[in-house]
From Swiss-Prot:
Source superkingdom: Eukaryota
Binding site for [4Fe-4S] cluster: C43, C44, C108, C139
Enzyme class, first EC level, given as a word: translocase
Name recorded for this polypeptide: NAD(P)H-quinone oxidoreductase subunit K, chloroplastic
Cofactor binding, per record: Binds 1 [4Fe-4S] cluster.
Organism taxonomic ancestry: Eukaryota, Viridiplantae, Streptophyta, Embryophyta, Tracheophyta
PANTHER family noted in UniProt: NADH DEHYDROGENASE, NADH DEHYDROGENASE [UBIQUINONE] IRON-SULFUR PROTEIN 7, MITOCHONDRIAL
Keyword line: 4Fe-4S, Chloroplast, Iron, Iron-sulfur, Membrane, Metal-binding, NAD, NADP, Plastid, Plastoquinone, Quinone, Thylakoid, Translocase, Transport
Length: 227
Protein backbone atom coordinates (compact mmCIF):
# COMPACT_ATOMS: atom_id res chain seq x y z
CA UNK A 1 0.00 0.00 0.00
CA UNK A 2 1.03 3.58 -0.51
CA UNK A 3 2.26 5.52 2.50
CA UNK A 4 -0.11 8.44 1.83
CA UNK A 5 -2.78 8.76 4.54
CA UNK A 6 -6.40 9.14 3.50
CA UNK A 7 -8.71 11.26 5.67
CA UNK A 8 -11.81 9.18 4.86
CA UNK A 9 -10.16 5.78 5.29
CA UNK A 10 -12.08 3.51 7.64
CA UNK A 11 -10.70 0.77 9.79
CA UNK A 12 -9.24 -2.43 8.40
CA UNK A 13 -11.68 -5.28 8.94
CA UNK A 14 -9.35 -8.10 7.96
CA UNK A 15 -5.82 -8.49 6.73
CA UNK A 16 -6.94 -8.71 3.10
CA UNK A 17 -9.98 -6.39 3.19
CA UNK A 18 -9.82 -2.60 3.47
CA UNK A 19 -12.93 -0.47 3.87
CA UNK A 20 -12.63 2.84 2.03
CA UNK A 21 -14.47 5.10 -0.42
CA UNK A 22 -14.38 5.25 -4.20
CA UNK A 23 -13.05 8.82 -4.01
CA UNK A 24 -10.04 7.77 -1.91
CA UNK A 25 -9.42 4.78 -4.15
CA UNK A 26 -9.42 7.05 -7.21
CA UNK A 27 -7.05 9.50 -5.55
CA UNK A 28 -4.70 6.70 -4.50
CA UNK A 29 -4.53 5.30 -8.01
CA UNK A 30 -3.84 8.73 -9.52
CA UNK A 31 -1.14 9.78 -7.07
CA UNK A 32 0.63 6.45 -7.57
CA UNK A 33 0.94 6.93 -11.34
CA UNK A 34 1.65 10.58 -12.14
CA UNK A 35 2.71 10.94 -15.76
CA UNK A 36 4.61 14.23 -16.18
CA UNK A 37 5.04 16.31 -19.31
CA UNK A 38 8.51 17.86 -19.05
CA UNK A 39 8.61 21.49 -20.21
CA UNK A 40 12.24 22.46 -19.67
CA UNK A 41 13.72 25.60 -21.21
CA UNK A 42 16.94 26.27 -19.26
CA UNK A 43 19.38 24.98 -16.64
CA UNK A 44 16.74 23.97 -14.05
CA UNK A 45 15.74 21.08 -16.25
CA UNK A 46 19.25 19.60 -15.96
CA UNK A 47 18.65 19.10 -12.24
CA UNK A 48 15.44 17.24 -12.98
CA UNK A 49 17.26 15.02 -15.47
CA UNK A 50 19.47 13.77 -12.63
CA UNK A 51 16.38 12.15 -11.07
CA UNK A 52 16.30 9.61 -13.88
CA UNK A 53 19.46 7.94 -12.60
CA UNK A 54 19.65 5.18 -10.02
CA UNK A 55 20.71 7.53 -7.21
CA UNK A 56 17.29 9.17 -6.88
CA UNK A 57 15.21 6.75 -8.98
CA UNK A 58 12.01 8.69 -9.58
CA UNK A 59 10.38 5.54 -10.98
CA UNK A 60 9.52 4.53 -7.41
CA UNK A 61 6.90 7.32 -7.40
CA UNK A 62 5.24 6.01 -10.53
CA UNK A 63 6.51 8.89 -12.69
CA UNK A 64 6.49 8.02 -16.37
CA UNK A 65 7.60 10.95 -18.57
CA UNK A 66 5.37 11.46 -21.59
CA UNK A 67 5.98 13.44 -24.76
CA UNK A 68 2.30 14.06 -25.50
CA UNK A 69 0.10 16.32 -23.35
CA UNK A 70 -2.91 14.08 -24.01
CA UNK A 71 -1.21 11.28 -22.06
CA UNK A 72 0.03 13.42 -19.15
CA UNK A 73 -1.65 14.61 -15.98
CA UNK A 74 1.27 16.69 -14.66
CA UNK A 75 3.27 19.39 -16.42
CA UNK A 76 6.58 20.42 -14.90
CA UNK A 77 7.79 23.83 -16.10
CA UNK A 78 11.48 24.54 -15.58
CA UNK A 79 13.16 27.65 -16.93
CA UNK A 80 12.28 31.01 -18.38
CA UNK A 81 9.02 31.40 -20.28
CA UNK A 82 9.04 34.11 -22.95
CA UNK A 83 6.09 35.90 -24.48
CA UNK A 84 6.60 33.98 -27.71
CA UNK A 85 6.46 30.64 -25.88
CA UNK A 86 3.43 31.56 -23.75
CA UNK A 87 0.72 30.53 -26.28
CA UNK A 88 2.40 27.14 -26.77
CA UNK A 89 2.54 26.51 -23.02
CA UNK A 90 -1.13 27.39 -22.57
CA UNK A 91 -2.06 25.16 -25.52
CA UNK A 92 -0.16 22.23 -24.00
CA UNK A 93 -1.93 22.74 -20.67
CA UNK A 94 -5.36 22.88 -22.30
CA UNK A 95 -4.69 19.64 -24.19
CA UNK A 96 -4.02 17.74 -20.96
CA UNK A 97 -6.96 15.68 -19.65
CA UNK A 98 -8.58 16.44 -16.32
CA UNK A 99 -7.52 16.31 -13.55
CA UNK A 100 -4.18 17.98 -14.25
CA UNK A 101 -1.50 19.58 -12.13
CA UNK A 102 1.39 22.02 -12.53
CA UNK A 103 4.74 22.24 -10.75
CA UNK A 104 6.71 25.47 -11.25
CA UNK A 105 10.40 24.64 -10.84
CA UNK A 106 13.00 27.34 -10.35
CA UNK A 107 13.09 31.10 -9.83
CA UNK A 108 12.91 31.84 -13.55
CA UNK A 109 9.61 30.00 -13.87
CA UNK A 110 8.08 31.39 -10.67
CA UNK A 111 9.03 35.08 -10.99
CA UNK A 112 10.85 35.43 -14.29
CA UNK A 113 14.24 35.49 -12.56
CA UNK A 114 17.05 37.77 -13.62
CA UNK A 115 15.86 37.62 -17.22
CA UNK A 116 12.69 39.56 -16.38
CA UNK A 117 14.57 42.67 -15.23
CA UNK A 118 13.82 45.46 -17.71
CA UNK A 119 12.72 42.87 -20.26
CA UNK A 120 9.65 43.15 -22.44
CA UNK A 121 9.78 39.58 -23.74
CA UNK A 122 9.76 37.53 -20.50
CA UNK A 123 6.72 36.32 -18.58
CA UNK A 124 7.12 37.29 -14.93
CA UNK A 125 5.70 34.13 -13.45
CA UNK A 126 4.16 31.12 -15.13
CA UNK A 127 1.12 31.45 -12.84
CA UNK A 128 0.03 34.37 -15.00
CA UNK A 129 -0.60 31.82 -17.78
CA UNK A 130 -1.64 28.59 -16.05
CA UNK A 131 -2.56 27.76 -12.43
CA UNK A 132 0.31 26.38 -10.36
CA UNK A 133 -0.21 23.70 -7.70
CA UNK A 134 3.31 23.49 -6.24
CA UNK A 135 6.00 26.21 -6.29
CA UNK A 136 9.58 24.94 -6.16
CA UNK A 137 12.01 27.86 -5.60
CA UNK A 138 15.73 27.73 -6.20
CA UNK A 139 18.31 28.59 -8.84
CA UNK A 140 18.39 25.76 -9.62
CA UNK A 141 16.50 23.54 -7.13
CA UNK A 142 18.27 20.43 -5.93
CA UNK A 143 16.98 16.99 -6.93
CA UNK A 144 15.97 16.41 -3.30
CA UNK A 145 13.76 19.51 -3.52
CA UNK A 146 12.09 18.14 -6.65
CA UNK A 147 11.28 14.90 -4.81
CA UNK A 148 9.84 16.94 -1.93
CA UNK A 149 7.63 18.89 -4.36
CA UNK A 150 6.34 15.66 -5.88
CA UNK A 151 5.60 14.32 -2.39
CA UNK A 152 3.61 17.45 -1.53
CA UNK A 153 1.66 17.14 -4.77
CA UNK A 154 0.84 13.52 -3.96
CA UNK A 155 -0.50 14.59 -0.55
CA UNK A 156 -2.62 17.22 -2.24
CA UNK A 157 -4.06 14.67 -4.66
CA UNK A 158 -4.90 12.34 -1.78
CA UNK A 159 -7.09 15.03 -0.16
CA UNK A 160 -9.08 16.00 -3.22
CA UNK A 161 -12.83 15.46 -3.36
CA UNK A 162 -14.40 14.55 -6.68
CA UNK A 163 -17.52 16.69 -6.22
CA UNK A 164 -15.52 19.83 -5.50
CA UNK A 165 -13.34 19.26 -8.53
CA UNK A 166 -16.30 18.77 -10.89
CA UNK A 167 -18.16 21.79 -9.51
CA UNK A 168 -15.13 24.00 -9.95
CA UNK A 169 -14.61 22.86 -13.53
CA UNK A 170 -18.14 23.91 -14.41
CA UNK A 171 -17.50 27.47 -13.23
CA UNK A 172 -13.88 28.05 -14.21
CA UNK A 173 -11.46 26.84 -16.81
CA UNK A 174 -9.26 24.92 -14.42
CA UNK A 175 -9.19 23.64 -10.85
CA UNK A 176 -6.61 23.96 -8.14
CA UNK A 177 -6.85 24.11 -4.38
CA UNK A 178 -4.37 26.95 -3.95
CA UNK A 179 -5.88 29.24 -6.59
CA UNK A 180 -9.48 30.44 -6.40
CA UNK A 181 -10.37 31.73 -9.84
CA UNK A 182 -13.50 33.67 -10.65
CA UNK A 183 -15.03 34.47 -13.99
CA UNK A 184 -14.38 38.12 -14.83
CA UNK A 185 -15.16 40.41 -17.69
CA UNK A 186 -12.97 39.99 -20.74
CA UNK A 187 -10.80 42.97 -21.60
CA UNK A 188 -9.87 41.92 -25.13
CA UNK A 189 -13.27 42.15 -26.83
CA UNK A 190 -12.63 45.53 -28.43
CA UNK A 191 -15.48 47.15 -26.46
CA UNK A 192 -14.06 49.57 -23.94
CA UNK A 193 -15.75 50.92 -20.86
CA UNK A 194 -16.96 54.37 -21.75
CA UNK A 195 -16.76 55.45 -18.15
CA UNK A 196 -13.00 55.00 -18.18
CA UNK A 197 -12.42 56.94 -21.36
CA UNK A 198 -11.68 60.64 -21.44
CA UNK A 199 -14.78 62.69 -22.10
CA UNK A 200 -14.30 66.19 -23.43
CA UNK A 201 -16.45 68.85 -21.76
CA UNK A 202 -19.41 70.19 -23.71
CA UNK A 203 -19.29 73.58 -25.41
CA UNK A 204 -21.73 75.07 -22.93
CA UNK A 205 -19.35 74.28 -20.04
CA UNK A 206 -16.39 76.09 -21.60
CA UNK A 207 -16.22 79.74 -20.53
CA UNK A 208 -16.01 82.17 -23.41
CA UNK A 209 -13.07 84.51 -22.89
CA UNK A 210 -14.42 87.35 -25.07
CA UNK A 211 -17.75 87.24 -23.25
CA UNK A 212 -16.00 87.53 -19.90
CA UNK A 213 -13.87 90.41 -21.20
CA UNK A 214 -16.95 92.29 -22.50
CA UNK A 215 -18.74 91.91 -19.15
CA UNK A 216 -15.69 93.33 -17.38
CA UNK A 217 -15.42 96.23 -19.86
CA UNK A 218 -19.11 97.14 -19.48
CA UNK A 219 -18.83 97.05 -15.69
CA UNK A 220 -15.82 99.40 -15.78
CA UNK A 221 -17.58 101.82 -18.16
CA UNK A 222 -20.71 101.96 -16.00
CA UNK A 223 -18.54 102.63 -12.95
CA UNK A 224 -16.93 105.62 -14.69
CA UNK A 225 -20.33 107.05 -15.71
CA UNK A 226 -21.58 106.88 -12.14
CA UNK A 227 -18.56 108.75 -10.89
Amino acid sequence: MNSIEFPLLNQTTQNSVISTTSNDLSNWSRLSSLWPLLYGTSCCFIEFASLIGSRFDFDRYGLVPRSSPRQADLILTAGTVTMKMAPSLVRLYEQMPEPKYVIAMGACTITGGMFSTDSYSTVRGVDKLIPVDVYLPGCPPKPEAVIDAITKLRKKVSREIYEDRVGSQQETRCFTINHKFRVGRSTHTGNYDQGLLYQSPSISEIPYENETFLKYKIAVSSHKLVN
